[in-house]
């Protein structure tokens, strides 16, 4: 939507007058947004720096919450930056995440074209692979784009696996 808020952008870069969309009851089926499966898969399986760990010293369950308030990535379709807060919330098992390597891992997303939904799921996969926690939840709270704010949450439980 342009700054005047009176046009919407359709596939192929065509602008549609918002009043015409309403008047003709144009739906999203009438507009080709141009997203492909290549866009959806882009960098979902990218190889990133290893997240290192250190031995947990306690047998009890306790929660570790790590926040990166200045997370950035790039939309694979538009090439525009995405900004957000990434929260890693986990209960360690035998290993804890080492913060410096985690920081370098997360910085790799800065210039990477990847959808927000893939970010939360990829970080979860890589955290689980690195430290095999009892439980982990990754939340990505992204700044609004086009007036819509996206909050993506992906979870893991060692007893139930991914999802419930």
Region annotations inferred by a language model:
Residues 7, 14-18:
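Aromatic (phenylalanine/tyrosine) cluster motif
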Residues 11-12, 25:
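N-terminal regions of proteins, emphasizing targeting and processing segments when present
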């Amino acid at each position: 939507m342009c700054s005047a808020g009176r046009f919407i952008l359709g596939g192929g870069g065509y602008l549609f007058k918002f009043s015409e969309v309403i008047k003709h009851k144009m739906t999203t089926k009438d507009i080709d947004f141009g997203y492909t499966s290549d866009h959806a898969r882009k960098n979902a399986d990218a190889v990133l720096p290893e997240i290192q760990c250190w031995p947990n010293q306690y047998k009890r369950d306790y929660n570790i919450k790590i926040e990166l308030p200045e997370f950035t990535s790039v939309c694979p379709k538009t090439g525009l930056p995405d900004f957000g807060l990434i929260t890693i919330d986990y209960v360690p098992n035998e290993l804890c995440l080492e913060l410096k390597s985690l920081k370098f891992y997360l910085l790799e997303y800065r210039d990477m074209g990847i959808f927000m939904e893939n970010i939360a799921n990829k970080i979860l996969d890589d955290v689980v692979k690195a430290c095999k926690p009892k439980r982990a939840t990754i939340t990505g709270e992204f700044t609004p784009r086009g007036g819509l704010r996206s909050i993506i949450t992906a979870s893991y439980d060692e007893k139930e696996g991914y999802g419930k």
